[in-house]
């Protein structure tokens, strides 16, 4: 039976991923998050772990011996005032990479980045071409660079989700959909809205 570790398992994507895995696989799951799960039944997989705290992170990963790691833990809002406000994204991935290496059991890993490594409308020339327009985006650029520099020996990939919404979502989409559902949305002008993806 495969062992899957999910960081950020209490977040929007993590919650939906766990629900999907429970329906589609018999893999053994473990989730790390600083927040409690959104769904009570996920408590049996959850451990309160801050990925910036290396010793605890290493201890839990070495003990669990995961085959697969899906790294979703991140600060994703746009309210930070300095790049240091997004330290969980950068320092977190560095410490996770080190702990995974110490475990020596991981065969595959997926690291979540963001479409915000490039500003809306920018078409990157290659995977090293970045144009972030927010501090959050800058933190994800640095996150990607740290992963690439580490060049893990296991199979790995970086994904850049675009705007996503669905069950258990939060800011900013919950506000938008509340406006739409209450018939308070209106579109000004005749031009189409600009898409960022």
What are these regions (language model features)?
Residues 4-24:
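N-terminal Rossmann NAD(P)H-binding glycine-rich loop of SDR-like oxidoreductase domains
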Residues 7, 32, 69-73, 109-115, ...:
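SDR active-site strand-loop-helix element
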Residues 42-53:
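Rossmann-fold cofactor-recognition segment
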Residues 51-89, 102, 120-124:
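NAD(P)H-binding glycine-rich loop region in Rossmannoid oxidoreductase-like domains
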Residues 52, 84-95, 130, 134, ...:
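Glycine-rich NAD(P)-binding loop of the Rossmann-fold in SDR/ketoreductase-type enzymes
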Residues 95-135, 149, 157:
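Conserved Rossmann-fold NAD(P)-dependent oxidoreductase catalytic core, especially the SDR/UDP-sugar
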